[in-house]
């Protein structure tokens, strides 16, 4: 319920209690009984946890992992940040190199793939293929909130400065997307942004090669290499979904750019494309605001503050 509807419900309860107090009391007693029936005290006995069972489950888990593109072997592919966060925690606590490397690969693949919005930030709900290339373009608050926490935790657990910066950029861009598109005047965040705009799925997010050439001019020569603008990567109707085949750091080396220069060039082009894209019909917003999903975002922002010591994240 939003605030208006919730107040309406509360007033209705008050009126019912005034006119039919016995009925309300009977309902309250029934509710209490139902809660008591579902309450289970913690047993005094020690847990029957067995390390062998967990290790067996981990072995079975590893058999389901996609070692080439991250995530699981089945499609469609969902990011499933809670799964990855478990693997990251278990991998670090048990020094399980396989799980640690799998999480790292998955985080790079989804952030470089088409499931990530390379212009305004934020992740789509899932990929329709094994390569994270073609997403279902809907963006959900709960996914992005958990991914903010996950990328923040990954940043805390790396000693590589370039990798840390990569994770940080993804977190900041993703939160920037949520702040700009889903935040309400009251401070809460809305549930989702639709996949469709102007009668087509993904139309807001995709580009033709001719559009990019016209907008980017001389920058197109390197942009097409970084974001795989080639005939064989075209999606449909001459449209391209932006995606990277390598990290920005590796690409920068080929261009003889320093890392700071690479980030500056990409950020400059993103601003240009973002301004052009905002002239299109935007996907509609789901105007519900759910406490549980907002709580996930609060958790993500707390993790990001710990990882990056960004006061704005904590204040938000």
Question: Model regions: which residues?
Answer:
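Short, intrinsically disordered, charge-balanced linker/junction segments flanking boundaries
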Residues: 309-316
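Replace the tail clause
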Residues: 1-300, 304-308
